[in-house]
A protein has these predicted regions:
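Interfacial loop-to-helix junctions that mark the boundaries of transmembrane helices
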Residues: 46-52, 157-168
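Hydrophobic alpha-helical transmembrane segments of multi-pass integral membrane proteins
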Residues: 22-25, 49-96, 102-110
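Short amphipathic alpha-helical coupling elements at transmembrane boundaries
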Residues: 3-14, 40-50, 120, 124, ...
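Hydrophobic core segments of alpha-helical transmembrane domains in multi-pass membrane transport
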Residues: 22-30, 60-68, 86, 102-106, ...
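Transmembrane helix-loop junctions in multi-pass membrane proteins
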Residues: 1-2, 30-41, 70-73, 148-162
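Short helical (or helix-break) motifs at transmembrane helix termini and adjacent helical loops
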Residues: 108-121
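Membrane-interface alpha-helices at helix entry/exit sites of multi-pass transporters
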Residues: 93-97, 126-142
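Core transmembrane alpha-helical segments of multi-pass membrane transporters/permeases
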Residues: 2-40, 54-66
Length: 187
C-alpha cells in the first residue's frame, strides 16, 4: 500500500509536461481565435487565392509540418489549423482530405521536431543522444512526407477520398519497392 501511495506524486510529476503542452496548445488556439485567423484564411481562400484551391491540401500539409516542427506539438497544430481548415472548406470530400492533410502534417512535423516531447522521451528512453535520435528518424519521415505531399497534390484532381486513399497507398507501396531495389543493389 505504501509503495502505491508513493507512486502517486511521481505519477503527477510525470504528467506535468504533458499537461503544460496541452495548456500551451489551448492558449495558442485561443490567440488564433482572438486574432480572427479562421475568418481571414476563409476569406483569402474564397477570394484572391481561389485559383489555388486545388493545391490546398498540399499547402495545408506543408504548413502543418512547419508549424508542428517549430512548436514541437502536433496537438497545438491541430488546435490552430483544424478550425481554420473547416472554416475554409466547409463540406464535401475536400474537407476530409484537407483535415487529414492537417493531421498528417502535424504528426510528421512533431515526429521530426527536436523540441517535441515525444522525441525527447523516445531518445531518453532509448538512452541515446537526442540529436542523433532525431537524425536517424529524418530519412524515414522524409520518404513518407514526400509520398504524402504528392498524394495531397493529386487528391483534389481525383475528386473523392475513395480513390485518393488507395492511390496514396499504391504510391507508398511503389516507393518502398523502388527503395528496396535501390538499396538491395548497394549491398
Amino acid at each position: 500500500f505504501r509503495d502505491c501511495m508513493d507512486a502517486f506524486p511521481e505519477g503527477f510529476k510525470a504528467m506535468v509536461p504533458a499537461i503544460l503542452i496541452l495548456c500551451c496548445a489551448w492558449t495558442l488556439k485561443g490567440v488564433t481565435d482572438v486574432l480572427g485567423a479562421k475568418v481571414f484564411i476563409a476569406d483569402l481562400i474564397n477570394g484572391p487565392a481561389a485559383a489555388l484551391f486545388d493545391f490546398l491540401p498540399a499547402m495545408i500539409f506543408v504548413i502543418s509540418i512547419a508549424l508542428a516542427f517549430s512548436t514541437g506539438t502536433s496537438w497545438g497544430t491541430f488546435g490552430i489549423l483544424i478550425p481554420i481548415v473547416l472554416a475554409a472548406i466547409p463540406d464535401g470530400d475536400m474537407t476530409i482530405i484537407a483535415v487529414s492533410a492537417c493531421m498528417a502534417g502535424a504528426v510528421c512535423g512533431d515526429h521530426c521536431s527536436p523540441i517535441s516531447d515525444t522525441t525527447i522521451m523516445a531518445s531518453a528512453g532509448a538512452q541515446c543522444n537526442h540529436i542523433v535520435h532525431v537524425n536517424t528518424q529524418l530519412p524515414y519521415v522524409m520518404v513518407v512526407a514526400a509520398v504524402s505531399f504528392v498524394s495531397y497534390l493529386a487528391a483534389p484532381f481525383v475528386g473523392t477520398v475513395w480513390i485518393a486513399l488507395p492511390l496514396a497507398a499504391g504510391l507508398m507501396l511503389a516507393t518502398l519497392l523502388i527503395l528496396r531495389l535501390i538499396l538491395k543493389g548497394r549491398t
